Every structure is written in C-alpha cells, then in structure tokens.
C-alpha cells in the first residue's frame, strides 16, 4: 500500500532514522524480535502483546507497509516501551531503551517540524 499523500518524504526520512539506529553497536538488542523461547522468557508474550523490533520496522518501511510516518513512529516507540515494560526499572536494558526513546522523540519532533505534519 502506498503512503498517504504528503507522507513520502517523512517516510523516507524515517528509513534514515531506522538505519542510523540499526548501525549503532549498542542497538543490538533491538535489531530483531526478542527470542523469548530461546531466552526462556515464557512470560514475555503475556506481558508484551505487540512485539516489535527495528528490523521488522525496516522491512515494513522497505515494503511500503506504513501509510504515515506517525504509524511508523508508533511502532518504533513500541520497541522502547516494550523493553521498558518487560525489564526492571533502572536495569541496563531499561536504561538503554529510555535513552533511545528520548533520542528518537527528539529526532521525530524535528522531522515533524521540518516536514510540517
């Protein structure tokens, strides 16, 4: 499905944001779906009802599966919020997700201002 009118440029910029996140060494925990079976995190699907990761988001962007940049941003925010919901407040994973959440919010706010949506 093609993006809605006026969303082509914002979605192109979202691809750049996602690629820049994926390139970061410390972003490894967010690149692929959580292997909850392999990690024996059997409660994960009960706690996290909408699993999301940056690799999946990138594939959805490449396949034009987002109508708007806002829908893509929601999925990116799920990556961070899922991590913070599942992991203990103040843990290494929680702190990493919190840091990425803040950075992403800043970049997305800037994108919205520049693209005027």
Please identify what each model-predicted range represents.
Residues 1-117:
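Chromatin reader modules
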